[in-house]
């Protein structure tokens, strides 16, 4: 074993296995590229991104942890979203009010 080495199981590892996926078209209406990280509650992403924010409620990008998607100005892009998991609470960013995504 090498310090920091990650040993994965044999075979294919499916990202977000079993999660329902939602596809949305996104257009960056701004004049600069926008990057959105893997665990951002997608409706709270940069307001220059034009997409159906209500359809994206409770969802994040379907990409590996620690990565991001870059949206270039004026280019339409279809993305895949999956539900946020765990406690489904979002603090900070622009959720008004911050906290639970689902009604209790």
From Swiss-Prot:
Subcellular location: Cytoplasm
Keyword Iron-sulfur included in the entry's annotation: no
Transmembrane regions listed in the UniProt entry: none
Catalytic EC class: hydrolase
Keywords associated with the record: Cytoplasm, Hydrolase
Protein name: Urease subunit beta
Principal localisation: cytoplasm
EC number: 3.5.1.5
Organism of provenance: Rhodococcus jostii (strain RHA1)
GO cellular component labels: urease complex
Oligomer status and interactors: Heterotrimer of UreA (gamma), UreB (beta) and UreC (alpha) subunits. Three heterotrimers associate to form the active enzyme.
Reaction catalysis annotation: urea + 2 H2O + H(+) = hydrogencarbonate + 2 NH4(+)
A single GO molecular function term of this UniProt record: urease activity
Pathway: Nitrogen metabolism; urea degradation; CO(2) and NH(3) from urea (urease route): step 1/1
